[in-house]
Swiss-Prot record:
PANTHER family: UDP-N-ACETYLMURAMATE--L-ALANINE LIGASE, UDP-N-ACETYLMURAMATE--L-ALANINE LIGASE-RELATED. ATP binds at residues 108-114. It comes from Exiguobacterium sibiricum (strain DSM 17290 / CCUG 55495 / CIP 109462 / JCM 13490 / 255-15). Its main location: cytoplasm. Pathway: Cell wall biogenesis; peptidoglycan biosynthesis. Keywords: ATP-binding, Cell cycle, Cell division, Cell shape, Cell wall biogenesis/degradation, Cytoplasm, Ligase, Nucleotide-binding, Peptidoglycan synthesis. This is UDP-N-acetylmuramate--L-alanine ligase.
Length: 431
């Protein structure tokens, strides 16, 4: 048993990794800011202790897991260096852990977390599976031989991983504070592809993934006719989305997923493809797909009077469009209201026009103050700049959330990667 201390344990990946190690019977604790973050609820439920940041948290018998947002000048890291403790960055440790299993890395600019959650749910019902999901959920299973984990492309961290399999959902330009453009992103994914040891499952509808080179087989999935796994006849039903799957030219089966929207069908296709490649029972896979309850902060619904409140992590223009599409398909007779909090000044500046285009797809739009990051607390852009590009949009503050009451019978989409949840909570508790 090893004694682990996590510096920044409330991070989504860090929280999940802490749970994995805890369930493997290691001693786990961590530290973070005092502010409530949704990931801490799972830590508390599993009895994993966490404390405010302090150099006094660091003890001589610990192995330190350093969160990506914290540098070597952090007081806890500095203390760990003084004590000559073993220190791993999160992504480095995760790479070593994955090497101990038959591993599946899920990566892509969008859809990583939902796809990781879906594959984890399906496999866990068929064979013992450990998993790490980017919504802060993790499970360590003693008898597991498979490990499903989310692999983030930011700063090329996923190059620390050499998985047996990889699912690649799409390639898009994001993280403009690091990547220089789409070619730089494509280059990173190409490097990742060369490290996969068994097979890659990639979305063939994505123009960049179509040109992927690898030393292992690539199975393509999507709606396009040239894909190895192809979805047809996608239909919204009261229970979700039904669709037919063709394996090249042959009918493979009909599947039902609880989600709505093309992106959910694509996520399911990738899972179906890798399960078929591994020889898993098709009926068992279909049964598990139909019972997937989703992941945290991905179209998480709350009934609130006549309204439906949705909490969603969408923080990129394409993710906003996908969330709005899901709302329209699930609730075709309701008004769709977007409440969006931009996450980082750099991202807003880089995608200003795209954000405006996506938000105009809603029936009404409210904008919240920009949420910075640990690396970026201010910038050369204002939320009012986005408001100018979205006709009829309003600025929403925590003091005026009651204005949302006028949207009776509407679906209110609270979207963002910052603290947009505080606006929803304020609205739910407003007198």
């Amino acid at each position: 048993m090893t004694n682990y201390h996590f510096v920044g344990i409330k991070g989504t990946g860090m929280s999940a990794l802490a749970q994995v190690l805890h369930e493997m019977n290691h001693q786990v604790q961590g530290s973070d800011i005092d502010k409530h973050i949704f990931t801490e609820d799972a830590l508390r439920a599993k009895g994993i202790p966490f404390f405010p940041f302090s150099a006094e948290n660091i003890k001589e018998d610990q192995v330190i897991i350093q969160g990506n947002a914290f540098g070597d000048d952090h007081p806890e890291i500095a203390r760990a260096k003084e004590l000559d403790l073993t220190i791993y960055h999160y992504y480095d440790f995760l790479g070593h852990l994955a090497d101990e299993y038959r591993s599946v890395a899920i990566t892509g600019s969008h859809g990583k977390t939902s796809t990781t959650g879906l594959l984890s749910h399906v496999l866990s019902g068929i064979t013992p599976t450990a998993f790490l999901i980017g919504d802060g959920t993790g499970a360590g299973v003693a008898e597991a031989k498979a490990f499903v984990f989310e692999a983030c492309e930011y700063k090329r961290h996923f190059l620390y991983y050499k998985p047996d399999y990889a699912i690649m959902t799409n390639i898009d330009f994001d993280h403009s504070d690091y990547f220089t453009g789409i070619d730089d992103v494509v280059s990173a994914f190409q490097e990742m592809a060369m490290q996969v040891k068994q097979a890659i499952v990639a979305c063939g509808d994505d123009e960049h993934l179509q040109n992927l080179q690898a030393n292992v087989p690539i199975l393509y999935y999507g709606f396009g006719e040239n894909n190895d796994f192809r979805a047809e006849n996608a239909t919204s039903t009261p229970d979700g989305t039904s669709f037919d799957v063709y394996l090249r030219d042959d009918f493979y089966g009909t599947f039902l997923i609880p989600g709505f929207g093309r992106h959910h069908v694509l996520n399911a296709l990738s899972v179906i493809a890798i399960c078929q490649y591994e020889g898993l029972n098709k009926e068992e896979v279909a049964a598990r797909l139909s019972t997937f309850g989703g992941v945290k902060r991905r179209f998480s619904e709350t009934n609130f009077g006549s309204q439906i409140l949705v909490d969603d992590y969408a923080h990129h223009p394409k993710e906003i469009s996908a969330t709005i599409e899901s709302a329209r398909k699930k609730y075709p007779d309701r008004e769709v209201v977007a409440i969006f909090q931009p996450h980082t000044y750099t991202r807003l500046k880089s995608f200003m026009d795209d954000f405006a285009t996506s938000l105009r797809e809603a029936d009404a739009t409210y904008l919240c103050e920009i949420f910075g990051s640990a690396r970026e607390q201010e910038g050369q852009v204002r939320v009012e700049d986005l408001q100018d590009k979205v006709p009829g949009s309003d600025i929403l503050t925590r003091d005026n959330v009651s204005i949302l009451r006028k949207h009776e019978n509407a679906v209110l989409l609270f979207m963002g990667a910052g603290d947009i949840q505080t606006y929803q909570h304020q609205y739910e508790n407003a007198k």
